[in-house]
């Protein structure tokens, strides 16, 4: 039997800046974008900046499956993260790896889009996990996680998943069973 659980919130955060104007993306929110941009940008063969994708799976679908596991209605579940490439991949390297980690803090999806002018800063960004006009920003804090630029997330046994690509489709089909099991056991408080 297969269940599909869709995210309740998703966004990406960007550590770079506009290559033409120099305006930073570090405080910009992309919470309402339809596309999650996961990339590393190189300028003249030098690393320029990267993005990270944030996905939240809280909600009734996940709670229902969680309860079914506790009640032993579902035994030995497997969890997969599936994301699909939306644009062409002509600039993608032939060999690369992606990692998935649970983050140590909650975050706010926000209301921004890439095309917003002026840019929207309401919600999470590379610099902040939450920000609203007229309020103090809530920065990414270290809650027993390790610093990984832009967010703090857990690492180590059971807290990471990865997928490698070698001349392969960029679609993500990653086994995240260990990460989800840690969350279900209460090891990850977020």
Task: Give a label for each model feature.
Residues 1-190:
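Secreted, disulfide-rich extracellular signaling modules
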């Amino acid at each position: 039997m297969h269940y599909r659980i869709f995210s309740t919130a998703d966004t990406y955060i960007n550590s770079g800046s506009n290559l033409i104007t120099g305006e930073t993306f570090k405080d910009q929110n992309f919470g309402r974008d339809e596309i999650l941009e996961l990339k590393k940008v190189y300028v003249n063969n030098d690393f320029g900046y990267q993005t990270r994708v944030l996905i939240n799976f809280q909600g009734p679908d996940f709670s229902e499956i969680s309860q079914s596991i506790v009640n032993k209605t579902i035994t030995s579940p497997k969890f997969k993260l599936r994301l699909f490439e939306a644009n062409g991949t002509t600039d993608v390297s032939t060999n690369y790896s992606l990692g998935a980690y649970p983050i140590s803090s909650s975050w706010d999806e926000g209301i921004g889009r890439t095309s917003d002018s002026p840019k929207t800063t309401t919600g999470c960004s590379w610099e902040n996990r939450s920000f609203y006009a007229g309020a103090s920003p809530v920065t990414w804090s270290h809650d027993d996680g390790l610093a990984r630029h832009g967010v703090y997330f857990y690492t180590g046994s059971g807290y990471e998943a990865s997928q490698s690509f070698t001349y392969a489709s960029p679609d993500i089909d990653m086994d995240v069973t260990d990460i989800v099991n840690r969350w279900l056991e209460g090891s990850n408080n977020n």
